[in-house]
């Protein structure tokens, strides 16, 4: 796939690494173009662009910014008509220990309102950056899960195919409204990692008997 990654922080860097390793064509952008250039230089199939040029002919946009910056970052890309936007954000408080919105809406639903011409899908939000960068295999050869929620079948299929290309199991989590559940799940994972001291090599998964 041809994929634009928006954000050069820990999650954006982890995506650039894994997408490049899987053979995807990656276009990287962020608030500081120099950071994007440094990141892109580390990987094959990766290039850096200012926001206005970052979309190019990408099929998919991975939104790897803070939630507060999400709408502005997406709108800076230009025309998103028909594009699949994978929202990995969580609406976290400053101390990362709570969510700023929830129950009656979600980060994904608010982002979808901001870019109604795009197909928004929630995915990857329950993974720490370290886990994403290290890949889907855990202890005892267990594979981690990526939960995928969207009102668009195409967006859901695209995010599912992308996650599977990186080696992850996927769970169909229904419509975008279920981001209201996935974001608190990420919040619990963050608490367990930092608040309960379990570290950042953990992730929620879904088991079948």
Which residues fall in each region the model found?
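Active-site-lining helix/loop region of Rossmann-like oxidoreductase modules
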Residues: 6, 141-209
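Short, well-ordered alpha-helix to beta-strand connector turns
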Residues: 23, 57-59, 118
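Rossmann-like NAD(P)-binding element
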Residues: 40-43, 51-95
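General beta-strand structural signal in soluble alpha/beta enzymes
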Residues: 48, 119-123, 171-173
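Rossmann-fold NAD(P)-binding glycine/threonine-rich loop
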Residues: 89-137
């Amino acid at each position: 796939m041809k994929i634009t990654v928006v954000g050069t922080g820990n999650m954006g860097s982890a995506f650039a690494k894994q997408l490049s390793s899987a053979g995807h064509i990656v276009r990287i952008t962020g608030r500081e173009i120099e950071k994007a250039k440094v990141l892109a230089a580390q990987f094959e199939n990766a290039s850096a662009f200012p926001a206005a040029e970052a979309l190019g002919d990408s099929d998919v946009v991975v939104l790897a910014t803070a939630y507060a910056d999400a709408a502005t970052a997406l709108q800076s890309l230009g025309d998103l008509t028909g594009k699949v936007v994978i929202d990995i954000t969580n609406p976290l408080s400053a101390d990362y220990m709570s969510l700023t919105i929830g129950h009656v809406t979600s980060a994904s639903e608010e982002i979808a309102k901001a870019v109604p011409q795009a197909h928004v899908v929630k995915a990857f939000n329950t993974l720490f950056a370290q886990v994403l960068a290290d890949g889907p295999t855990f202890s005892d050869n267990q594979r981690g899960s990526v939960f995928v929620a969207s009102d668009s079948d195409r967006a859901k299929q695209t995010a599912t195919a992308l996650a599977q290309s990186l080696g992850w199991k996927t769970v169909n989590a229904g419509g975008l409204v279920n981001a209201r559940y996935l974001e608190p799940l990420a919040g619990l994972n963050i608490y367990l990692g930092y608040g309960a001291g379990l570290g950042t090599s953990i992730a929620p998964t879904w088991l079948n008997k």
